[in-house]
Amino acid sequence: MSETRATRIGLGVWVALVLAFLYVPIVVICLYAFNPSNIQSWPIGGLTTKWFSPAIHNPDMQQALWLSLKAAALATLVALVLGSAASFGVHRFRFFGRESISFLLVLPIALPGIITGMALNSYFVFWKFNFGLWTIVIGHATFCVVVVYNNVVARLRRMPASLTEASMDLGADGWQTFRYVTFPSIATALVSGGLLAFALSFDEVIVTTFTAGAQNTLPIWIFGQIRLGQQLPQVNVVVFLVLAVTIVPVALAQRLTRESGILRTE
């Protein structure tokens, strides 16, 4: 056996082990959603869908899911606006403290979630904010802005300045240049940044614990049910459905974008 072939096989085995490490627990949870018993034991004693209806019609789960979707959507919207605006400002203009501002923009995602959560909680209490949807959105936006900013600023750095200059030389105004040149170039970065921001917000637990007050988002509801050992079959169903739904935006993003990283406008 040649060294090249041995290396290829070794790398293949290593990749298979890594993928198994990442996805086998997810597959097991998905199988537990069809477990006829309310006790999580392996192997499962058959397949059933009897837990799906109770899980879907659970009012506490529905309320938590709706709150998570609203918070994630609003946090993503805030992140897209602020993150893209910040990336344009940092990339296009030269000013004193530019690198420091860039560092401060990406710092929140590097901080431990418990630090961010405690800081936000103290701030909200000091200013007598009512804990609820908007405090959750503010908390999630602190790290969602980072992923949008990183994606967009990285794409802007790879975008040749000559494209914008050529557009202006051909008589296009600022809006036309943005619409036909800049936006198609950064569209995939916005899509990927928005999807990642939504995913991070949707499954956030630590920061949400400090900013949600008495309300439960879906991850907090799941954590509470697992910690108390209640409704585990329904929790497994909810986890399975969430995993299934998350495939949709990823597939749409792949369909709407192209390998070149440029979104077609025609």
Listing of model-derived features with the role each one plays in the protein:
Residues 1-8, 73-105, 118, 122, ...:
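Transmembrane-helix boundary motif in ABC transporter permease subunits
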Residues 62, 66, 70-82, 86, ...:
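Hydrophobic alpha-helical transmembrane segments of multipass integral membrane proteins
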Residues 2-14, 153-164, 168, 174-183, ...:
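C-terminal transmembrane helix and the adjacent membrane-cytosol boundary/short C-terminal tail
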Residues 3-7, 37, 52-60, 208-259:
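Interhelical loop and adjacent transmembrane-helix boundary motif
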Residues 13-14, 19-26, 117, 149-152, ...:
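Transmembrane alpha-helices
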Residues 29-40, 148, 189-223:
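Non-cytoplasmic
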Residues 24-59, 211-213, 266:
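Short membrane-interfacial helix/loop motifs at transmembrane-helix boundaries
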Residues 39-44, 49, 98, 114-143, ...:
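Membrane-interfacial helix termini and adjacent extracytoplasmic/periplasmic loops
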